[in-house]
């Protein structure tokens, strides 16, 4: 888990057969507790691995605004059926994006929630790209999607960690040893980030 500045807040090694949302509380709750009372607002964005009603209820209970990717299903696609039909004529030469807002309640949810759909027709493609986000934000749909899309920067930080510090190089014979090794990799990552910031000239010194 990263914050908006690229700081690695928390990481954990888990078995390959474990769902990505399992154990979410051991990752998310300590980070929220660390920031509670120190910042005025906390926002959370995540991929579909955190699409879990327990996560939603925890964030809502803590007053945290969130935008979480929601896996597509037949019911969601039926709600935006009119946006999934391609216009008659030649495919567009430029991307066309449409947004939809609606309330939705999955079987395990205790209440309906706001869902935003983004439908994108790209030049040269026969079928649209569709994404769903569940959110408790009151922002316009385009703004919520833009906020969630910044999660892609986090993916880049993960790639950098894999390339520079070899996060995924865990050759130990035991799971526990590899878990410790991952934490050492995380510490090395944050040490590198801190050194880079200390070396970066301030605006006052550069005159900018």
Residue ranges and their predicted role:
Residues 1-38:
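Electropositive, glycine- and tryptophan-enriched low-complexity nucleic-acid-binding patches
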Residues 6, 42-51, 66, 133, ...:
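Short, conserved catalytic/metal-binding motifs centered on acidic residues
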Residues 16, 47-51, 71-73:
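Active-site beta-loop-alpha junctions enriched in small/polar residues
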Residues 52-57, 77-81:
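A short acidic (Asp/Glu
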Residues 56-65:
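Short, surface-exposed basic-aromatic patches at helix termini and helix-loop junctions that form
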Residues 65-166:
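An anionic, glycine-rich sequence signature occurring as long contiguous blocks
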Residues 123, 172-182, 206:
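Structural motif
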Residues 191-208:
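A short, flexible helix-boundary coil/loop motif
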